[in-house]
Amino acid sequence: FQLSTRPMLLVRDDLYVKHVNRVMVTIDGTGVGDDALRTACELVREIPGGTLTGVHVVRQESAPSRGGRTKADEVLDAAVQRARGFGVDMKAIHTEGKDIGRSVCLAASECNADLVVIASQDRRPLVARGLVDLDKLLGGSVSDYIRVHAPAPVLLVREPEQG
């Protein structure tokens, strides 16, 4: 699945979800993160009574600006507005944790998510993108932690192919 540029649904063998009503999406303020938000909004719009929760995790709380708002507040506010633009009301959660993957999984448990939508960027140089990413292969990425430990199926949204 590392080389796919299409969204992929990843379901652990021990998970069973009869209905998807509560969708949680990770918010990171990146372009591929915006793609994940768009995908989550499109899904929730088609679910009668569906709800969307956006979670933004920071490793360390940043200092508020003059207006008393942090960068995390700005990222979440922009995501809420973007979701509204897709016709979806999104509940926003801001959390702090040294281990982002673990914090995302904890948030998914707390909001009782039926589906977790995450973005996964390929940070390798363009010349290496056709090759296997050893960090992901060995399970060293945030998205891999979430994929393995999330309490719900994970919809992995990859960045579109450049070209």
Please provide the spans of the model-predicted regions.
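Charged docking surfaces used in two-component/phosphorelay signaling
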Residues: 95-103
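Small/aliphatic-rich secondary-structure junction motif
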Residues: 18-69, 80-93, 113, 149, ...
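Structural motif
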Residues: 11, 94-95
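Gly/Ser-rich helix-loop-strand patches that form or flank binding pockets
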Residues: 1-16, 110-163
